[in-house]
Amino acid sequence: MPKKILFTGGGTVGHVTLNLILIPKFIKDGWEVHYIGDKNGIEHTEIEKSGLDVTFHAIATGKLRRYFSWQNLADVFKVALGLLQSLFIVAKLRPQALFSKGGFVSVPPVVAAKLLGKPVFIHESDRSMGLANKIAYKFATTVYTTFEQEDQLSKVKHLGAVTKVFKDANQIPESTQLEAVKEYFSRDLKTLLFIGGSAGAHVFNQFISDHPELKQRYNIINITGDPHLNELSSHLYRVDYVTDLYQPLMAMADLVVTRGGSNTLFELLAMAKLHLIVPLGKEASRGDQLENATYFEKRGYAKQLQEPDLTLHNFDQAMADLFEHQADYEATMLATKEIQSPDFFYDLLRADISSAIKEK
């Protein structure tokens, strides 16, 4: 009988990415892989798109809020239903372990696995735990963290960032699509790549639209999330979404302007890519991006600019400062010890699963 592992996590791409890195490794080693999530969530979309041999189990989901809302009442019942569904799934499958990447959908499966005596392993990407992982921590066997946590928690293992991206990713691969973009760009100008993510692209899109003079100073690549903005013209490439072209565009850029999501930040760190962080504020998130950005700035990896301060004058000043001190930023990033390979983490996780099973 093959070993079985349950994955969960969703709500944003960041809550799925690491799972999609680990799943093929388990499949290759003969594990039967199952995933618990929201059938309308991005986790289901990404699993379907991956083509991996994974059985998806849909459960009811409700959002966990730190503030009062009448919707909390309805969501309590959704979470309760999700827990019952998760208990049934875990009891039926009898997996060796559950791995959670967080997000609201992950709490019921984590609780269910713990109640049924299954080891629970969680990964936290941000400087501080989100509400879902704070709850899940109580039921976890081990929590792996990208950042060193300020609170000394007994179940936490500081891992560093797990990414497939490394310094050699700066080598630009051959691409006919990329060659077409280069024809519109000037070799005499620095190339900037704007990455806003699913929640933060709009501000960058508007900033570029409001300041056409940017095209006179830089080559601009703008991943917009909006197909209506697609454009390839002199010194400007706007595209709604990229997959295979993402890494070539990243390598092509002299500097990346990004939000403060940890996955992207650590990809940039792994590549030693010069970057400016414009984090989402507390009005658009729980403040995790502000913490991530401050951490990166204090470590000397990057410079940050708060969204309310994103004016053309401040932006140009930030660009000048970053390019003036480019060698210092790159040297600091190259010296980092905060990056781990997927193989390293997979081996660690497998060893911890084996230890947890033996201790039962």
UniProtKB/Swiss-Prot annotation:
It comes from the Bacteria. This is UDP-N-acetylglucosamine--N-acetylmuramyl-(pentapeptide) pyrophosphoryl-undecaprenol N-acetylglucosamine transferase. It is found in: Cell membrane. Pathway: Cell wall biogenesis; peptidoglycan biosynthesis. Gene3D superfamilies: Glycogen Phosphorylase B. It comes from Streptococcus pyogenes serotype M5 (strain Manfredo). It is a peripheral membrane protein. Belongs to the glycosyltransferase 28 family. MurG subfamily.
